Amino acid sequence: MEVALPNVPTKMQHPFTKYSEWKFKLFRVKSLERRPSEEETEGSEVSYNSSQETYPKSTVVLEDLSLGSAPQSPTNFKPQQSEKSNVVDNHETDLKRLEEEAHITVIQQLCRICGASFKMDQQNRSYPVHGPVDSETHDILRRREKKVTSWPELISKVFKTDVRADVDTIHPTQFCHNCWTIMNQKFSNISSEVYFPHNQAVEWTPHSANCYVCHSSKPWGKRKSAPQLNPHKMKKRKRGPEFVKKSKTSSGNSIQWKNMKAFNQMKDSCKKIHLDNNLLVLDYPSDFVKSVSCLVCEHILSDPVQTSCKHLFCRICILKYIKLMGCYCPSCKYPCFPTDLTVPVKSYLNVLNALLLKCTVSGCDEEISLGKYSHHISKHKETKGKEVYAHINKGGRPRQHLLTLTRRAQKHRLRELKMQVKAFADKEEEGDVKSVCLTLFLLALRARNEHRQADELEAIMEGRGAGLHPAVCLAIRVNTFLSCSQYHKMYRTVKATTGRQIFQPLHALRNAEKALIPGYHTFEWRPPLKNVSTRTDVGIIDGLSGLNQSLDEYPVDTISKRFRYDAALVSALKDMEEDILEGLKAQDLDDYVSGPFTVVVKESCDGMGDVSEKHGSGPPVPEKAVRFSFTVMNISVPNKNGPVRIFEETKPNSELCCKPLCLMLADESDHETLTAILSPLIAEREAMKTAELLLEMGGILRNFKFSFRGTGYDEKLVREVEGLEASGSLYICTLCDATRLEAAQNLVNHSITRSHCENLQRYEMWRSNPHHESPDELRDRVKGVSAKPFIETLPSIDALHCDIGNAAEFYRIFQLEIGELYKNLSATKEEKKRWQATLDNHIRKRMNLKPIMRMNGNFARKLMSKETVEAVCELVPCEERQAALTELMDLYLKMKPVWRSSCPAKECPELLCQYSFHSQRFAELLSTKFKYRYEGKITNYFHKTLAHVPEIIERDGSIGAWASEGNESGNKLFRRFRKMNARQSKFYEMEDVLKHHWLYTSKYLQKFMNAHNNLKNQGFTVDLDNPDLEQRLESSMESLESMEF
């Protein structure tokens, strides 16, 4: 960098014109007149451009600044006025420009926030004040759900400094790594040794004659300048003592001095409320005394709190210190905020409360432990108060009645009485002040013959008040889909209308729901579960917890919340505790049977499309969701004559028993995301297969074993999790190895051959190709396995999706029969669309069935009926085709109950026996009358319906009971809970939906809700004295039930 001085004499040219990075070589031109500070002292002013004054001749002195000091400001020196005023003006302009450039160069090497030099950091790291935050900070803010994306916003939040209106000539444009670390540490849990060097951010001012940045007397680090080259040319004026320059304290030091003064006053005031460590009875080591003393006031700790750097203070002392001196630890200068303060561990508090102290009351020589010291002192005050207490009215305003006073005045007037009641409660009732006061109130009511209020108070004291049980209120809130705010409004309305607390407040409901959410009950596994924590107080966790860090190469863009599988099963069993104990009694078994109980669990998983919401903050995630749930199907216990079933789910396809386990905003087709979320859950499931659960139930420790059956999957998801090709594959079935052609040629005679273990073996063969076969030969060997299976499913048929798939095929057959495709196999697409429109219009008129874009369960149930076939036959001209179509539907309706019923052996034994005959006749019709459609091909669900139903029922006893219908119904609840009961945030809404859905499936709450509904149906009302209030309460309850939230 070269600097030229135009219009400057040759003798004033600088010998060096290049500047290094750390050293500046500047001219200093000094005049023989006084400095500006001296002129201010003497009360005179001198103007540079004044033509009326005569300036003596100046000399040029070259000064070399030492390393690390700021360049000397040329404003301390005045050039001599020459004979030509324009030359002087040019000199002044050039010097001002040079000093402003030097000022800007200096401030660009300083931090905008704390003013520290970047050279203090060995790596010379700095960050721009204006602009977006860096990637590391952005990730931290994203995890903490902060919307801040730029440095000015973040600096404003952390340091309370607005940098948006900064000017480059006044303010630095960079900040240091120390301030960057403080900002990151504010929003993360990572601690590091960093502290803010000042109590407040530096205030920057424009460059002036007394600029503390450029001037040699800057407040943070003045260094002695190099010796002058020509000291004999400088003339020092003699000055009297009245002109000696007073040392000026900077504004920062003044503020610090005031803060220190306030801090000392605070320490003095602590003597009145805190105990000095000289009161300790024993002669403890000095280090121990320090460990039990506050590091601010140096007294014994009172209400101790611990900072994140593990230092201990009195709560009031550290809060006052932070307010006065800044948010950092007084001991180590580590950043410390009031929200970071925590209570020390209980063992330390026990040691602290056990310290023996001398009583400060004169005449008392007792030695009291610190924990009982306040109680001991209160006894002295009580004794003194009894001696001197007497009501004295010294005139002035008359004493008002107690009930007309404010709460603060009531406390003041009743203070002595409160102390006496507390002393009595501590002595006689183990400190139960509430019971003493309630009993006094009860006796006062009885003495005044106010027995009605006394009865109500007594009922409240005994826990049998007129209000509803908190569990009933919680059941009402969950089953009516009320959010917390809606319930609170209803609670206040009913309380204000009736004057009674019929419903319980929200905090009572939250206490009730804690015992119903997983993570409340303690349990143990033998042997301990592999790779699963032994903690039992685990509630809702992030869906990605337990995921290996090696998966960071694939970004998982999803939000997922789940329960830990074992904790969820424990909570479900405790929720069914009454049912299990009643089952033992019903089977004439002893109540103290310890097991082992065998619990059979049905697992279901399904994807949901289009769950997008207009609201919610957070990262962009797919607008699809996946739900994983389970249902406890039955529980059995071994007996002499074999296992005895003590519990069986009566409605296995109800949404009331299908408990949610995991929710995620993801696409079920995204194999990587699905694997990342469900793999930890599946690992917990595999670990539980070989372990026994020890759980206390009915006061006895009992053993439980679990059997998991993955049957609630549709065909698409089965192929996804078992590593099979998609549903359009050549290999048509997920239960056997038949190809589509083999299934069409032999419609009935097939058996289940696939299994999870075999799919794993075939995947290894597909991956390694040990026989070095061609792709077609290898595919034929592995029978359609193309990915690694990661969830074990039971080879079965999902009854709900079987209905939907078969109904879609019948819907297609109806269209083709209307168009008589058997006559003309080369029909165009326009003709087929016309046939579909004709069918839709006809069944809309006759059956009131509106056409839909995608087949669902309700449409399938209405479509598959005799009425529908009769309506379709009106559009089929040929009577022979009408008879074939009617017979085909009749056979289907005879087969359907076999796979739809929960127990076909009890519900439809005749149809179960005739199933093979009906399936043979159904297959015969397809291969003859409907040969035009099923020659050489067959649909997936027709194949499963005709070939595999008898074998599955023989193995499991039912197909319908193991269907995914409960999980499908849970999908509707997911949408409703997300809309009504969840916070509007992508992170928190999943947690809220999971919690509310779990409470909705609680059998404990369902019993309370059923009992409440029975009482309401029987005409049960609250016994109120005022009939008008009763009518208003009933009308408010009716309006509540009629509300559509």
Swiss-Prot record:
Residues that hold Zn(2+) 3 according to the record: C309, H311, C329, C332
Gene this chain is encoded by: rag1
Subunit structure: Homodimer. Component of the RAG complex composed of core components rag1 and rag2.
Region (Disordered): 33-55, 67-87, 222-253
ZnF region ranges: RAG1-type: 355-384
Alphabetized UniProt keyword annotations: Chromatin regulator, DNA recombination, DNA-binding, Endonuclease, Hydrolase, Metal-binding, Multifunctional enzyme, Nuclease, Nucleus, Transferase, Ubl conjugation pathway, Zinc, Zinc-finger
UniProt cross-references to InterPro entries, sorted A to Z: RAG1 (IPR024627), RAG1_imp-bd (IPR035714), RAG1_Znf (IPR019485), RAG_nonamer-bd_dom (IPR023336), Znf_C2H2_sf (IPR036236), Znf_C3HC4_RING-type (IPR018957), Znf_RING (IPR001841), Znf_RING/FYVE/PHD (IPR013083)
Protein name: V(D)J recombination-activating protein 1
Biased composition (Polar residues): 44-55, 69-87
Organism: Xenopus laevis
Localization (cell): Nucleus
Amino-acid positions noted as binding Zn(2+) 2 in the UniProt annotation, renumbered to this chain: C294, C297, C314, C317
Enzymatic reactions: S-ubiquitinyl-[E2 ubiquitin-conjugating enzyme]-L-cysteine + [acceptor protein]-L-lysine = [E2 ubiquitin-conjugating enzyme]-L-cysteine + N(6)-ubiquitinyl-[acceptor protein]-L-lysine
Transmembrane regions listed in the UniProt entry: none
